[in-house]
């Protein structure tokens, strides 16, 4: 049916219709319309729309058939991580996208926008925050993503400067659930430290005294 509609009008008319109406979704309806991509003045808009709405099959088709020549596939990966579309993220990585591009921006995007499934995938494939996950906790705390904070905070954690910054960021942004969680983890950590030191004093220090 869509093919019949396409054939009913000259290409030039369809281009004018799409540009004037801004109905760019029409380009995604079938393979004939998508071939108008380079004739319509909406390159960035349509690619962003494809990724944002999770049109995986459309993206796959236009890339593999070279309907769209993507000069930097990492830019598309950043969009996919921002909008949290895991199938598209996996596909782009399989096509050579760098999960550590632009100083690990893919995982930063996924963390900030709260896409835990994408974060887990990127971490499992080697994505890092400059060698540690501390910066991830700061980003997740700032944006209010408790599930991601919990993912990055290990069971035994050393509350160094980054953790204190995360607590400040969560407080300033009024993410009380994260503030409560980080405070509880901090209390738990210091309790463990106190018990460890008490045990050390009780069991080892008396033996080093000289009488």
Curated annotation (Swiss-Prot):
It holds the Pfam family Ank_2. InterPro entries: Ankyrin_rpt, Ankyrin_rpt-contain_sf. Gene3D superfamilies: Ankyrin repeat-containing domain (1.25.40.20). Keywords: ANK repeat, Repeat. ANK repeats lie at residues 31-61, 72-101, 103-131, 133-162, 163-191. The keyword Methyltransferase does not apply. PANTHER family: ANKYRIN REPEAT DOMAIN-CONTAINING PROTEIN 39, ANKYRIN REPEAT DOMAIN-CONTAINING PROTEIN 39-RELATED. This is Putative ankyrin repeat protein R810. It comes from Acanthamoeba polyphaga mimivirus (APMV).
């Amino acid at each position: 049916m869509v093919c019949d509609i396409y054939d009913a009008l000259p290409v030039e008319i369809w281009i004018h219709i799409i540009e004037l109406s801004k109905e760019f979704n029409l380009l995604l309806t079938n393979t004939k319309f998508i071939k108008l991509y380079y004739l319509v003045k909406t390159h960035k808009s349509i690619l962003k729309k494809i990724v944002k709405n999770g049109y995986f099959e459309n993206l796959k088709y236009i890339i593999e058939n070279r309907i769209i020549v993507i000069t930097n596939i990492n830019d598309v990966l950043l969009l996919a991580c921002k909008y949290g579309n895991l199938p598209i993220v996996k596909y782009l990585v399989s096509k050579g996208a760098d999960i550590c591009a632009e100083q690990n921006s893919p995982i930063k995007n996924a963390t900030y926008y709260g896409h835990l499934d994408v974060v887990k995938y990127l971490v499992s494939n080697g994505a890092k925050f400059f060698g540690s996950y501390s910066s991830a906790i700061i980003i997740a705390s700032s944006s209010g993503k408790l599930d991601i904070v919990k993912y990055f905070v290990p069971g035994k954690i050393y509350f160094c400067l980054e953790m204190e910054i995360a607590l400040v960021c969560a407080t300033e942004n009024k993410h009380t659930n994260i503030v409560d969680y980080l405070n509880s983890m901090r209390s738990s950590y210091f309790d463990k430290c106190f018990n460890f030191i008490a045990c050390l004093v009780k069991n080892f220090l008396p033996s080093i005294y000289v009488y």
